[in-house]
Amino acid sequence: MVSADNRLTQRAWYYTEVFTDPNNENVVYVLSAPALRSIDGGKTWERLSGTHGDYHDLWINPDNSKNMVIANDGGAAVSFNYGKSWSTQSIMPTAQFYRINADNLFPYNIYAGQQDNTSVKIASLSLGRGSIGREDWTYSAGGESAFLAFDPDNPRYVMGGSYLGNINLLDTHSKASTKVLTAPIQYLGRAARDMKYLYNWNAPIIWSKHEPGTFYHCAQLVLRTRDMGMTWEEVSPDLTRNQDDKQGNGGRPYTNEAVGAENYGTIAYMIESPHEKGVFYTGSDDGLVHITNNGGESWQNVTPKGLQECLVNAIEVSPHDPATVYIATTRYKFNDYTPALYKSTDYGKTWSNISSGIPQGSFTRVVREDKDRKNLLYAGTEKGMYVSWNGGQKWESIQLNLPKTPILDLMVHQGDLIVATSGRSFWILDDLGLFRAYEKPQMAAKLYEPEAAYNGFWYSAMNGNSPSFKGSQPFTGVNPANGLVIYYELPKLDSTEISMEIRDAKGKVINSFSSKGDKGYKRYDGGPPPTPKLPKSQGLNRFVWNLGHAIMPGVDDIYIEANYRGHRAIPGTYTISLKVGDKIMQTKGVIKEVPSYDTTPGQYETFDAFMTETEANLTEMHQMVNGLFKAKNQLKKVLEKVDDEGLKKEGKTLMDEIDAWDKEMVQRKSKAYDDVENFPNKFTAEYLYLINATDSSIPRVNQSSVERRKELDAQWSGLKQRGVALKTIKIPEFNKKLWAAGIGAVQL
C-alpha cells in the first residue's frame, strides 16, 4: 500500500483519476472531490485550492510543469505557477443545467438545477440594460439536481428538489425556505433496496395546471401534496421494473457509492396533460411508461411494445391534441447510442419510432412540440439540436450557432425555444415565428410575419443585422433584439431596389427603409445617424425595426447636442409592406405594452400625438433652414454676376434677411462636442431638446413639456411666418428681377 489517505478513493466510482508529472516521477496528482498532489511518490498529500471542486481531468504541460489546466464540475482553470493560483471560472459559460422551467412574467425567468451549484433563476431579458449580467440571476429552491415547480403566473413559492429526496419550498418574497421532504430519512450510504423512497438524481417535481396548490413528486412511485408539502400521499404503485439485483450498493466492488446519482429503478420524468384534468404520464429510468386518467387512482402500463430497458428521459404531451404524446429515450448507459424517439396518437396504446434523420451517436434526451405549429418538433440530443417539420417523419440539424454539446432539456415558451446544455449553459432561440411560418424554399420573394415585440427599452447586440455577430458575448448573456425582427426571402440578386414601409392602423407611414440606404446622407459631428439599410441577399434576410419613427433631419455641419431618432411606435398592430420590383408583399407586426409599465388608458395615445406633432415640427424647421441656407448660398453666387448696383444691393439686403432668420434658428458656430458650452443654443436646438426631454421609457407627457412647447410654438409661429415669406414671396419676387436682368434665378 502506498497511502491509506481515504481522500484518494472516497468516490472512486465517480471521478478518481491519477496523473503523473511528466517531468518528475515523484509528483503525482489524484483527482477526487478535492484535487490532491504528492511530491514524494504518494507518501504525503497536499490539497490544491483555488477552483471549484469535484475534479475530473488534468493536463500538465510536458515542457513546463508549472503550467496546468484542470477540469471540474465548475468548468476549467489554468495555472502558470504550479497550482498556487488559478484563472477564474466565474466568467466561463460552462454551467450544466438539467431541467428547465419558466414563469409567465415579463421578462420571463428561467429556472433550473445547475450541476454542483445551487439551482438558478435568471431573467431572459435585462430591461434597461445592454446585456444579461450577474444582477439578473439568483438562486432558487432545491439544489444542483433540481426539478423546480411553481405557479408560472405567480411564482412566489418555488418547490425544488435535490438528490435523495431533499425538497424545499422557497418563498421568493422573504427569501426564506422550509424543508418539505416526503420522508426525512438519511439515505446516504444505504443500498437502494433499503430506501423507502427511491429517487432519481433528477427526481421529478411538477406543479398541477388543473389543481391549484397541488404538487407531485416522484420516487419509484408518485407522491402528491395539496398543502404545500405539509403532508404527502402516495398516488401510484411502483411504476418501475423494481429489479432487486440492481438495487444494491453502488460503485462496488471498489467503494460504496450511495449519494443518489447511481440509484436505479426510479421515475425519471412526469408530465401532466395541459388539456385534461387528471391525466398524467410517467417515464422510468429502466424503460417503463405509465398513464393515469383519473388523477392517480389507477395506472396503465403503456410502454412501447418491444422497448428495451432504457432511460425515459422526457415526455411531451402535444399542445394540439390530447391523445398525442412523445417520449425521448436513451440507452447510453448500455453503451447503445442509438437515437430513439417515439410518438403515440392514442394515449400510448400504440407507438411509432420517429427518429429518422438523427444520426447514430446522437442519442436522444428530449423532444418538444411547438405550441403554435402542429407537427413542428424540436429534439435535443447528445450531439446537438434537430428539427422536424412533419411530426417526426424526418429530422434535420438546426445547430446554427449553438455549441455542439449535449442538450439536456428544451422548453417552448413565449415564442422562444429555451435550451439547457451540459456544459455550455442556457441558450435561447428567439425567432420561433420564422420556424412556425417556414415552408420549403420558394423561387418567389416572401415576407414573414414577425413575432410580436414589446415596447420596452433595452439594448441588444442582436439589434443589428450583421452576420458577423454569432449570438454570444464575453462575460454576459445576450438580450433578445429590441424591436420587430422581420424576415424575408429573396430568390435572386439583381440591381432592383427593395423597400419597406411601416404603417399604423390609420394607414400613416411611420418609417420607411431601402436597400440603397439614405441617398445623399452626410455624416458629421452632432448630426443624425443614417436610416438603417435593408439587407439584400439571396435567400433569407433579417431586418430589425427598432420601433422608431423616422429619423429627423439635421442641419449640415452643425453640432446639436441631441438625439434625432423618432420616438418609438406605441402598442398596436402595424402593416409592414415589402416592395421587390413590381411585387408588394404585406404582413402585420404587433407591438405589445410592457406589463410592468404603470400606464393609464389613453396615455400611449397622448404621448404619441404629442411626440408625432413635435417631431413633425422639428422636421419642418430643419427642412426650411436647409432650404433657405441653400438659397442664400445660391444667391451669393448669382450676385457675383450682377452688374446693376441697385439689384445687387437689393439682393444683399435679401441675403442679410435670410442670414438674420438663420441665426435665430441655428447656431452655426457649433461644430464639435464642447462647442455647445461656448456658443448658446438657438431655436431648433431648444425644440429638439424638448423632444428628447419628453421621450422616455414609460410614455408620459408632463405638464412642463406641454407648457414649454406652447412657448416654443409661439416663437415658431413668428419664425415660420418669416421663413415662409422668404421662401414663397421675397425670393420668388427677386427671382423675377433676376430673370428680367437675364441672370439665372435662385432655385428653391
Question: Where are the regions that the model predicts?
Answer:
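Beta-propeller blade termini and top-face loops
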Residues: 1-474, 481-484, 514, 518, ...
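Low-complexity, Pro/Ser/Thr- and charge-rich linker/hinge segments at domain boundaries
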Residues: 434-460, 588-622
